[in-house]
From Swiss-Prot:
Residue span(s) of domain IQ: 47-67
Biased composition range(s): Polar residues: 88-99
Domain of life according to the entry: Eukaryota
Organism taxonomic ancestry: Eukaryota, Metazoa, Chordata, Craniata, Vertebrata
Pfam families: IQCJ-SCHIP1
Alphabetized PANTHER family for the sequence: IQ DOMAIN-CONTAINING PROTEIN J
Protein name in UniProt: IQ domain-containing protein J
Amino acid sequence: MRLEELKRLQNPLEQVDDGKYLLENHQLAMDVENNIENYPLSLQPLESKVKIIQRAWREYLQRQDPLEKRSPSPPSVSSDKLSSSVSMNTFSDSSTPVSVSRPLAWTVLH
C-alpha cells in the first residue's frame, strides 16, 4: 500500500474512535443531567429509569401549580352528603342492610 492510501484509510478509523468517545461523553453528560451516579451494571438501568421518572414527575407537578392557580378545580363532593348517604343505609341498631342475591332466571321469570 502506498502512503496516501494508508492515510486515507486511517482517517475513517480516527473518526470512528472520535465518534465512540463523543458518544461516551454524551452519555456521561446525560447521566450528570439526570443525576445518575455509577452503579453496578445490574442496578444502573433500573436506577437511571427511576431517577428520570422522578425528575419528570417533579417537572410535571411544577407545571401543574400555575395551571391550578389559573383555573380552579370543580367543587368536590362534600363530606356531609357522603355521611348522610351512609347513615341512610344503616339501621337504628347499627347493622347494615344485607342484599339478597337471586338467580337471574328467578328474577326474569317472576
